[in-house]
Every structure is written in structure tokens, then in C-alpha cells.
């Protein structure tokens, strides 16, 4: 299947509406295997070989709802796009959102070497990717003989599945979060085991009576496991309810374009079955050990001690201690990981950008086919737009860029320096801008001068370099006056017209400060800025700095565009630059990790405190008689407090030590799976201090109760 994408505009209304159009070969419907909701899809007769395509259009579901109010009588109506009428022949279902398009039009494939297509493929059943790669590589080699400039010798085919394309970007993060969920599950199950063991130990007399009356060990185990499973099922039901409510929130936190538009992320039947099965399995697994331990009571000892409060015994205390230590260790690991993720995200938030995104926005304006086909006409159109927008009272300044809107600027290309050899593999980023661009983004000039408006409009062969390039190639500060050449600056009309001789030598007239040009984390690359008339594009951005919140000015900006050309639309998705930054893959991904890890860590901390509180409360209850005897013999409250804290000190201390070792051992994995995360010793020490404080707080209330015991009451305690 072949496809192309373009931005069109409706021309049957007062104000033009931006429409994202995907042109498809007529086999698209069968290729994707998705039948239309209404009418039909594209068919071969819509784009006959050697002829212009038929004026038919298939609507996306969202455009059908937005533009036609989901009217089922839409078939046969006419939609005018850029003054051309198209007959509506179909509407696609909600799940089909290929290209996030509004409309689908028949595509006419051409042999024009300037046209490029990225056709999605569907492999035949039984054909491996390796076999398909080999077959396609042979085909590419044949193409290279006809158009060698499009297919250099190093060109290789590497098929990638659609799911792989998305999993590649987010897969490591999902595995990391799955690991965090697993840790939280183990911590929760450990907590349940502690509670079951404590409750079961308190029931040893009851269980011994049952055994003495003939209850077999298997029956006692079944009873205890049933109680454990009741907790698991109740917890699973509550968890599923919370998941149904929380999944939409988590999807909102996901980085934009993390999944295909067609992906339906919801709690479906497989997820439900997995959750219930996991709940039952953990209920059996973590309830089995306490059940087996409690199903072998010492009948003689227990019955003889029936008039006294039962104690857990050495083995029971050891199991309690191990469970508490494991819970503390895993909680420390999760808290340390969360601290590292949060620190990495905070560092990313405070990354020096080199430009000021506050109160600035980018307004994208697509040029229609067969309009402004020369560089003079196109530059005059955009300069008129820029001047009108800059004159608005809410606007501080406005500039033009065809490919340099932060946070990802420019395109990489080979270059030459006059009198200085440059390795073939070296590249720089080329940015096409107007002189006002630097004023709008507050990028300072460090040396020399900017090119001015007159030089831009006549296509003067001038260039500015960033600080990184100046230091790399002219470390002594001699960049001004040097000459540089970018061979690919040559125009390709009518889509990319350019000023005459744009691919000739350019003179460097200034050095500007570095600005991040490849996302938020990648180091700044060598870059040049040239007048945007050196190579015009079909999509151009007007960068606007405002005195107020930028999006409140958007209506006025649209009115200015309409005043210059009533048929010209503004692209639908307009954001201020701060919003563009927060939709970047690394920003949204680290935010997701930090938020979820933080939430999991807080839950783990609460579970650990609850588990430790339960253990200490149980110990105090079991040793009430002992504490009464000690106090009757003269022991003070401080002595009793010390005994209570000492009863858990070994378990907590061992858990902290194990958690520190685990955290430091696994910090490399965290850094690899969550880029930017930093779990250094300071974070681990802070978490240790936090857990020590939490453990102390968990022990305070039971310890206070123990130290406040009336010796006479304690001696009578059963």
C-alpha cells in the first residue's frame, strides 16, 4: 500500500478549517482489513492507472462527528477542500485512525523523483522478516541503478513491525513499571503473610482444640488457606475496580504517540483473568507457609498453657523477623528507585534550554498545492503574515521558521568549510529562520551580527553558527568571515523553492548561543542558521511571543491569516512552546515513571509501616504478662520501651542493610531502563533515614501501650 499525507482546508465555510488528509492507494481498505462504518472504502476505480484520481473522499470517524454531527445521511454529500469538490463515499469506524487523519483520498503514484513514499507492508503468511528483507534489498538494488542519488550503496532494508516500533520507545519503561508493580505485590503479600501468621499464632489454642477433637492437618490447612483466599479475592475485586477508574488517568500520563492510534488500552477479559489468577495464586502461595506452620500445634504444650496467653515460640518469631526484614528491604529498593526517577525528572525539568519558551507559541501554516510556487511569492506571503501578527497589541514579536521550532530543530546534512577538510560523516543541523527568530526565543548574539530583513528577503548567502560549531571548528574565535557550504540547500520547486544559488558558499556573519536542538537530553550539535528564503518548505511556522498567555491570542492570529488569504488555514494543533516541551517523549516518559514509581513507593511505605505496626502490636500483646512481671520487679518504663524497640531492631536493621545492597546493585538497571534516573548514595541514605523514622513511628504507639501497663492488670492478663 502507498500513502502520502497533506494538510488541506475546507473552503465551503466562513473560516477555513484545517483538515489532515492521508492519500492512499485504493487497496488500503483490504490492506488494513477494516471495513467502513458507512458506505465504502477506496476502490481501484478511484485511482485508475495513468489517470487522475476520482474526486471521492472517505471521512474519518472523528471528522464525521466534528464536521457533520455524526449524520448518517452524509453519503453522497459534497465536501470542498481547497476549492475542489469531493463526493463523500464512506465513513471509517472509530478504531481506524491511520495517520490521525481527518479524511482519506485516493493516491496517484507518480515517478517524480522528488516524491517520497513510506509504504506500510503486510507480509504473506509464513514469510519471515529476514526473507522479506532479502527480497526487498534485491529490489532496492535495482532501484539504485535507476536513481542512485535516492539509494546510496550503504542503504539497507530493515523491516520493523508496527508494534515493535512503539514498544521500542516505551518497552523498557513498561518493563520497569511492571517490575515496580511486582515489588509492590510482593510487599503487599509479605504484609498479608505477617498478619496471617500473627492472627494464626493468636489462634493456636483454638487450632490445638480442633486438632485434639480429630481435625486432620489437611483440614486445618484448608481452613487457613480459605481465609487467605477470601482476603485475596476481596483485594482483587477492589483492585479491579480501582484499575477501571485509574487506567484512563495512566493513559493520559503516557507520552504522546506512545501507542498506535488504533490501540485500545483498557481492562479487557485477558487482563481481568490474569488479575484474578494472580490474586488466587498469591493467596495460596503466601498463605501456605503460615498455614503449614500453624497446622502442626504442640498439643500437650498448648493445652498445658491454656490458662495463659500463648507465645509464638522461637520459630514463629524467626518467621516474623524474616518477613519484616524482606518487607523493609523491598520497600527501600522501591523508595530508592522512586527517588532516583524523581530526581532524574526534576533534573530534566531544570535543563538549560538555551531559549525561553515562556509566553511563546508556534503557529504552523501549510502552503496549499499550486500556491506561492516561487520563493519570492512565498516569502512575501509569509512576511506579510509575520508583520500583521507582530503588529497585534498582545504580541511582543513574531518570527518565521520553516524547520527550527524547539525543542527539535533543523535537519542534519553534510557540509563543507572553505579551506578546511571536513570528514564525510560529520554533519550539522541547518535551520531556516528570519532574523526575528532570535528575538522571539531570546537566543543571544555572542559575536558578529544577525542577517537583517532586507538580506533575508533577497536571499543573501549569509549564515550564523551556534557556539558549539564555532568552538569545534574555529576554537580561536575566528568564525566570523569564514565560508561554509551546504550542498543540499538547492531548491526543489514547486514544493521547496529557494533563492538563487542557495547551495553556493555562505559567509558566516555571527555566532549565537547554543540552544537545544534535539529534544531535552541530547547534547547540542553543531548548527547553522540561514535566511528561510534559502530553502522554502510547504509547512512554515510563525513563532509568536506574547504579553499574555499565547493561546488566548490564537483567535486574533487566525483572523490575521484570514485577512491575508481567506482560503489559508492554521494547522489545527497549536500549542505554546512549554506545552510542546511537555509532550516530548523523554519528558512525558520520565514524568510517567516518576509519578507511578512515587505512588508505588508511598503505597509500599504504608504497607511496611502497617506490617511493622502489626508485628509490634502482636509482640506487645503476647508479652503483656512478661512486661507486667518486669515492672512488678522494678523495671521502669524506659526499660520496657527499650525491650519493645529491640524486638524489631534486628529485623529492621537487616532489612535496611539488604535493601541498601539491592539498591546499589540494581542502580545500573534503573539507569538503563529509565534514562535520566539517578539513584546515587545520597538518595539511598535519605531513604534509609526515612524508613528508620517510619519504623520508629510504627513502634511508638505499641511501645507506649506496653510501658503504660498496670503490673497488677498484666499479671492477671490471659
Protein language model regions, located:
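Mid-to-C-terminal secondary-structure elements
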Residues: 6, 20-46, 53-175, 248, ...
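Membrane-helix entry/capping segments
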Residues: 15, 50, 133-183, 201-204, ...
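Conserved G/P- and acidic residue-centered "switch" motifs that form tight phosphate/ATP-binding loops
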Residues: 39, 60, 90, 191, ...
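Alpha-helical transmembrane segments of integral membrane proteins
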Residues: 162-167, 196-222, 226, 246-372, ...
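Hydrophobic alpha-helical transmembrane segments of multi-pass inner-membrane transport and secretion
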Residues: 170-205, 285, 316-344, 589-625, ...
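Intracellular coupling helices
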Residues: 188-232, 296-310, 610-651, 708-716
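Small-residue-rich transmembrane alpha-helices
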Residues: 193, 229-302, 340-343, 646-708
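C-terminal transmembrane helical bundles of large multi-pass transporters
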Residues: 521, 560, 566-657, 671-672
